[in-house]
Regions:
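Mid-to-C-terminal alpha-helical segments outside catalytic/metal-binding sites
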Residues: 1-13, 19-48, 225-237, 245-279
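Active-site gating/metal-coordination segments in enzymes
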Residues: 47-48, 58-156
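Alpha-helical scaffolding within the catalytic cores
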Residues: 30-37, 61-69, 92-96, 158-161, ...
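Active-site neighborhood of phospho(di)ester-bond hydrolases with catalytic His/Asp-centered motifs
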Residues: 7-10, 51-53, 81-82, 110, ...
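Conserved, mostly hydrophobic/aromatic
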Residues: 11, 41, 67, 109, ...
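Short, electropositive alpha-helical surface patch
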Residues: 61-77, 165-166, 191-202, 253-257
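Active-site environment of divalent metal-dependent phosphoester hydrolases
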Residues: 15-17, 56-59, 87-89, 116, ...
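Catalytic pocket-lining loop regions of alpha/beta-barrel enzymes
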Residues: 104-108, 121-237
C-alpha cells in the first residue's frame, strides 16, 4: 500500500486462541483469519491497524510468538502490541521484558486489569512503565466493562489510571474503550493528564442487535460530550475491538460525530500516526 495513511485502527485482535469467538454470538459471520481481517480493513478504508496480543494464550511467550508471526505476514499493515500480567510475579515480568528486548517491532504494551486482578497503578508494573519510557512506546490499559462476567470491574475504573499517569508523565497511556460505562470519568483523566489518550474501541454492538440504533445514538452523544469535556480531539483514537465489532460500524461512530472534518480525520488516523510513529 502506498500514499498517506488516513485511517488507523488502534485496537484489534487476531489469534487462534480466540477461535471460540464465533460461538459467542458477537460475530457469527466473520472470516477470522489474517486474510479476512485485511479484506475487512480494505472495505472500511483502514490503512494500518494495531494488533493487540490476546490474554488467552497458554503463556505470554506463546501469545507473543503468534502475534509476531501474524504481523510479519501482514505486508506492513499491522503493528504489534504485546501484554504482560504482573500477578505472575516479578520474574515473569522480567522474562517478558527480556523478550521485548528481542522484539524490535514492538509498538506498545497492553495491560488487562479486570481480566487479571491488578490495578493499573500496581507497583509491580513499575518496570513495565519504565521499559515503555525507554522504548518510547505507549501503554494501552483496559478500562470499563469486561466482556465476561468473571472480570472484576473494580480494577477497571479510568480514575485508577490517574496515579500512574502522574508518576510516569513521559509515558503515553491509552484508556481503551474510553472507560465505558465511565466515559465522563475517562474524559476527566484525559483532560487532566497530557500523556493520556482514549480510544473508541468496543463501544457498539453488532448491527443485528435489536437496540443497535438507540445504542449508537447514545454512544455518539456520550463520546461527543467527552470530547467537549477534554476540550480537544487530539488525544482521542479510533479503535474497533475487532472481531467483536465490525470495522465499518466502528468507523461509522467516528464519522458520525458532530466535529470539524479535521478533528474526525485526527481521530481516524492522524493522532494514531503521531502516537505510534506511523508514516
Amino acid at each position: 500500500m502506498t500514499g498517506a495513511i488516513s485511517r488507523v485502527d488502534t485496537h484489534l485482535h487476531l489469534s487462534r486462541y480466540w477461535r471460540e469467538i464465533k460461538a459467542t454470538g458477537y460475530r457469527n459471520d466473520i472470516d477470522y483469519t489474517l486474510n479476512g481481517l485485511l479484506h475487512e480493513m480494505d472495505a472500511a478504508g483502514i490503512d494500518r491497524a494495531v494488533l493487540i496480543q490476546v490474554n488467552d494464550a497458554p503463556t505470554v511467550r506463546d501469545g507473543l510468538a503468534e502475534a509476531r508471526g501474524i504481523v510479519s505476514e501482514s505486508a506492513g499493515r499491522l503493528r504489534l502490541v504485546s501484554t504482560v500480567d504482573p500477578t505472575k510475579g516479578a520474574e515473569a515480568v522480567s522474562d517478558q521484558i527480556a523478550l521485548w528486548d528481542r522484539t524490535p517491532e514492538l509498538a506498545g504494551i497492553k495491560l488487562f486489569p479486570g481480566y487479571n486482578p491488578f490495578y493499573p497503578h500496581d507497583r509491580r508494573l513499575d518496570p513495565v512503565y519504565e521499559y515503555a519510557h525507554r522504548r518510547r512506546i505507549p501503554v494501552l490499559i483496559h478500562t470499563g466493562d469486561t466482556m465476561d462476567a468473571w472480570g472484576l470491574v473494580k480494577y477497571t475504573r479510568p480514575i485508577e489510571v490517574d496515579e500512574v499517569a502522574v508518576r510516569f508523565r513521559d509515558v503515553p497511556i491509552v484508556l481503551c474503550h474510553f472507560g465505558n460505562p465511565w466515559i465522563d470519568e475517562a474524559a476527566e483523566v484525559v483532560y487532566k493528564n497530557p500523556n493520556v489518550y482514549a480510544d473508541t474501541s468496543g463501544l457498539l454492538a453488532h448491527p443485528s442487535y435489536p437496540l443497535f440504533d438507540r445504542m449508537a445514538e447514545l454512544c455518539r452523544k456520550r463520546v461527543m460530550e467527552a470530547i467537549l469535556m477534554v476540550g480537544s480531539a487530539e488525544r482521542v483514537l479510533y479503535g474497533s475491538d475487532w472481531p467483536l465489532i465490525d470495522l465499518k460500524v466502528a468507523v461509522g461512530l467516528v464519522t458520525s460525530l458532530d466535529l470539524p472534518e479535521r478533528d474526525r480525520a485526527a481521530i481516524l488516523g492522524g493522532n494514531a500516526c503521531r502516537l505510534f510513529g506511523l508514516t
